[in-house]
Each structure stands twice: as C-alpha cells, then as structure tokens.
A protein has these predicted regions:
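Structural signal for membrane-spanning alpha-helices in multi-pass inner-membrane proteins
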Residues: 28-32, 126, 130, 155, ...
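Generic hydrophobic transmembrane alpha-helix motif, especially the helices
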Residues: 56, 60, 66, 90-94, ...
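Amphipathic cytosolic juxtamembrane alpha-helices at the membrane-cytosol interface
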Residues: 64-79, 83, 103-111, 161-165, ...
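Glycine-rich helix-loop "coupling/hinge" segments at transmembrane-helix boundaries
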Residues: 129-132, 144, 159-160, 208-250
Length: 277
C-alpha cells in the first residue's frame, strides 16, 4: 500500500491537483481573515475599478471588492460540492449495496428507479427542482444529490456483484455472520476504492452544477457563491470583465483539482489499468 501512495505522490499532476485543492480549502476556511474588505461593502465611487495595488482583482459594478467576495464565495461553493457529493455517495452506497447483495426483486426495483433518474436530463431536472422549491443552498444541495446518486449506486452494485461470491465472504457467512455484517464489514470496505474515486469527481461536478444554476439566476441570493458572482457580473462583463474572470478561474481550479486527484486515486486503486495502457 505504501508503494501505491508513493506512486500517487510521485505523480506531479496529482500532487498539483492536491496542492490546488488544499489552497482553495485553506482560503475558504480563513477567508474572513485574508479578505482586505467587507465583501458586502458598497462604494459607488469605486464602481468597476480595474485591478490595481489596492483592489487586487478590481471591484464589481457596485464597488465591492472582487477578491474579498471570491474568497467568501469559495467557502459556499466548496461546501455545496462536498456536502452534495457526500449525500449522493451515502444514498448511492445504500441503494447499490442492497441491490447488489440481495439481488432478485429488490435489485430489479432499485435499478428501475435508478434508470428513471438517469433517463431524465439531469441539469434540466435540477433547474425544475430548484425553481419549484426555491433558490436556497439547501435546495441546491438536495437537487444535486438527487441527480448524482445513481452513479454511485450502479458502481456499488457492480462491486457487490463481483465481491459477494469471494471465499472470504463465504467463510464469514458460514461462520454465522449476519447480512448486515456481510454488507458493511466484509464487502463494503473492499468495494470502497472505486467509490472514493467517483465521489471525488462528484465534488467538482456538484460545484459546476451549482455554478450553472446560479448563472441562470437560480442561486441563493442571500449567499455569495462563485456561481452567484458570475451571474451578477454577466450584464457588466464588457466593461468589468475582471468581476467574472476571477470567480470563473476559481471554479475552473476547483473542478480541475478534484479531477486530477480523482485520476491519481484511480491509479493508486487500479494500478493494473495504468500498466495495460
């Protein structure tokens, strides 16, 4: 196992993604400490000020410091991505493990439900859900989780179908292990590798979905997120392009970092795939 992680850290692309994500996480945690201005401080006299020594990435159309707002917004966007991916992963693991372990009619019903969610265009469904129930951070998280759990469910099911016939599972069953123990103590820990990789990629996907919803005007107006910043800067992009460029770059870096880390973890968990290539 140590050799596998050594391979991860020797892959400069994965390490680069990890460094970016750590920097973004630290920025989100200590945002109020490093923000030079109040993110909601309005100053008409400094409207649409270009980047300079005082305002590092300029101000927006209302005179608010873009850097201070982006630092605060990064926290919200990361939280949405992490929580939505976490909820999606938990639901997917539960559905996939039950489906793969028990099979039969339960597997048939759960997989048909999964297919229903996968048939409907996901972003369109997210727009409908948020429009119906309100543009709040909680509703956005729930909408994203509802759209992405089938990915984890199908992956978990395939892992369970592959692992439940292994000898160590049969030995535990003959030893009197209950179904709960077989699922959560014997099979699931050995199936977690690919699930962790997919969950990592879901964080970036959730952040992109939140940004897309916010860009369409469905973001939480009471919270500053990177997507909300893009939406608010859209009418003024011709003469205050920096107000859209910086939050857009933050979204790009966050999604890029999660994808690079996911690829690195995949190489650690499935080294033979890399060797075959």
């Amino acid at each position: 196992m140590e050799n596998k992680w050594r391979n991860f850290y020797s892959n400069w692309v994965s390490v680069f993604g990890l460094i970016i994500l750590l920097l973004l996480t630290v920025t989100a945690l200590i945002g109020p400490l490093i923000a030079p201005f109040d993110p909601e401080d309005l100053e008409i006299g400094r409207r649409a000020t270009a980047p300079n020594a005082m305002y590092w990435v300029g101000t927006d159309e209302l005179g608010r410091d873009v850097f201070s707002r982006a630092v605060t917004a990064t926290r919200v966007s990361l939280l949405v991505g992490i929580i939505a991916a976490g909820v999606s992963t938990l639901v997917g693991i539960l559905v996939g493990s039950l489906s793969g372990f028990f099979g039969g009619w339960l597997d048939h019903i759960l997989m048909r439900i999964t297919e229903v969610f996968q048939v409907v265009p996901q972003f369109f469904l997210a727009v409908v859900l948020v429009a119906l129930f309100g543009a709040s951070v909680l509703n956005i998280i729930v909408a994203i989780a509802l759209l992405t759990w089938p990915i984890i469910a199908r992956l978990t099911r395939s892992e369970f179908l592959s692992l439940k016939s292994r000898q160590y599972v049969d030995a535990a069953y003959l030893g009197g292990a209950s179904n709960t123990r077989l699922i959560f103590r014997e099979i699931l820990p050995n199936a977690m590798g690919p699930i962790i990789v997919s969950a990592t990629l879901l964080v970036g996907r959730a952040m992109l979905t939140e940004a897309g919803l916010s860009f369409l005007g469905l973001g939480d107006p009471s919270r500053i997120s990177l997507g909300v910043m893009l939406y608010q800067s859209r009418p003024f992009v011709q003469f205050a392009w920096w107000a859209a460029l910086f939050p857009g770059m933050m979204i790009f870096l966050a999604v890029l970092s999660t994808n690079l880390i996911g690829d690195g973890l995949n190489d650690v968990i499935n080294p033979h795939l890399n060797e075959e290539e």
